[in-house]
Amino acid sequence: MPNWGGGAKCGACEKTVYHAEEIQCNGRSFHKTCFHCMACRKALDSTTVAAHESEIYCKVCYGRRYGPKGIGFGQGAGCLSTDTGEHLGLQFQQSPKPARAATTSNPSKFSAKFGESEKCPRCGKSVYAAEKVMGGGKPWHKTCFRCAICGKSLESTNVTDKDGELYCKVCYAKNFGPTGIGFGGLTQQVEKKE
C-alpha cells in the first residue's frame, strides 16, 4: 500500500510516524510515546536503548534475555537482583547479622540519631555532607576552604597544605618555598665582596 505524504510506520504500533514525533533506532522509526522497552515498558532514550533484531529493550531487560548466562556471569554493576538461585537447585543461606557494638550515651538527640559529624579545622563547627570539601585530609566548609594568608577561595587544583593549614600555591611559594637568587623573588640582599 503506498504511503501518500505520510511518514514512516512506527515499529511498535504500526501507525504513521511524522517527523516531529519520530525517534529512529536501528533503522526503524518510533513515536516518542511508543519508544518503550518491549519487556518492562520502561520509557527509553538513546542512552538506555538496546536493540535486538526488530525489538527494543532497556539495557537491563536486554541483558537478562540476551546476555551471558550461568554461574559467574553477573548482571553487571548497577543491577540488583533478588534471584536466589532456587530454580537452579541452589540453597539460599542468609548470613547472620554481626552483633552491634555497644554505644556510649550521647547527650544530643541529633548526634544519637545521625552520628557525630566531623569538625571544620578553620571554624570548629560541624561539617555536613552537603557543604563538605576535603583538603589536607580533613573536611572543610566550602566557605572556610580559603587560603590562610590572602583569603582566596581554593579548589583542588590550587590548594597546598602545611601544618594543617591551607594555602593557595602563590602564598605557599612566597612563604614556604625556596629563597635566594634564581628562585623568583629575591628575599635577601646579596653582599658583594670587594
Curated annotation (Swiss-Prot):
Description of post-translational modifications: Phosphorylated by PKC/PRKCA.
Residue ranges annotated for the LIM zinc-binding domain, each copy included: 10-61, 120-171
Upper taxonomic lineage: Eukaryota, Metazoa, Chordata, Craniata, Vertebrata
Classification via Gene3D superfamilies: Cysteine Rich Protein
Gene name of the encoded protein: Csrp3
Protein name: Cysteine and glycine-rich protein 3
Known partners and oligomeric status: Self-associates. Oligomeric in the cytoplasm and monomeric in the nucleus. Homooligomers preferentially form along the actin cytoskeleton. Interacts with TCAP. Interacts with LDHD, MYOD1, MYOG, ACTN2, NRAP, MYF6. Interacts (via N-terminus)D with GLRX3 (via C-terminus) and PPP3CA; GLRX3 and calcineurin compete for interaction with CSRP3. Interacts with CFL2; the stoichiometry influences F-actin depolymerization and possibly two molecules of CFL2 can interact with one molecule of CSRP3 resulting in the highest functional impact; the interaction is stronger with phosphorylated CFL2.
Keywords of the record: Actin-binding, Cytoplasm, Cytoskeleton, Developmental protein, Differentiation, LIM domain, Metal-binding, Myogenesis, Nucleus, Phosphoprotein, Repeat, Transcription, Transcription regulation, Zinc
Location of the region described as Interaction with CLF2 in the Swiss-Prot/TrEMBL record: 94-105
Short motif (Nuclear localization signal): ranges: 64-69
